Amino acid sequence: MMLLRSALYGLFLLVTVVPWALVAVTYSVFVRGDRMYWLCVGWLRLATWGAKAICGVRYRVTGLDHLPSAANAHAAVLLAPKHQSTWETFAFPALMPHPLAYVFKRELLWIPFFGWAIGRMDMIHIDRGRRTAAWAKVQREGRRLMAQGHWVIMFPEGTRAARGERGEYQTGAARLAVTTGTPIVPIAVTSARCWPRRSWLLRPGLIEVSIGRPIPAKGRRHDELMREVEGWIEAEMRRLDPEAYPAQGGRP
């Protein structure tokens, strides 16, 4: 049954993304910025809803009150979530009250229809093989987008980690936060419970998203700041999904 539901969900994504992306690409000729962003987020909301309706993937979010309110549209924050699956890539723009600017590898732009649409959005796509140029672009574009009220989102581990595992936390998000004096918000997410990495077989269940309090970055050392972010995320992951982690011992 899971295989059938997952296949139906994949078909649902394919059938809906093609017309939505074509509309978005056409629309982008005339309109960019926030209106373009929210048009594309409409499909991400549909994708998140489809995972629930077809595959039984539910979610619960706590800590939204830790984020700036809609009345404070230009209060910039930098989001630093745990990265376990494709789910948070789809869901976070649908869950957050302000436009998000993802930092992502440029290869995603090559995905037909989906990549064409995100290429028209105010995001930061980088060549991970050119680290110096990539960081310069993140710093430059991050400043610009946060000044416009966007929230930059960077996955500190850089790539998806399997359930119960801890990836190597990179300091890029902390460096950007320190450079711009922007608070960094750690986020724990248990998406691998339902949507494991490198898999399109979705399991019914509940994904927990826990948003931490913003951590001030001004005047901090980026390595020390990232250790604090990592410590909060990993401790919260153990609290939310204890069966995925060893009962005793250190780093999983």
Summary of predicted features, one role per range:
Residues 1-60:
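N-terminal membrane-anchoring alpha-helices
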Residues 50-76, 246:
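A short, well-structured juxtamembrane/interface segment
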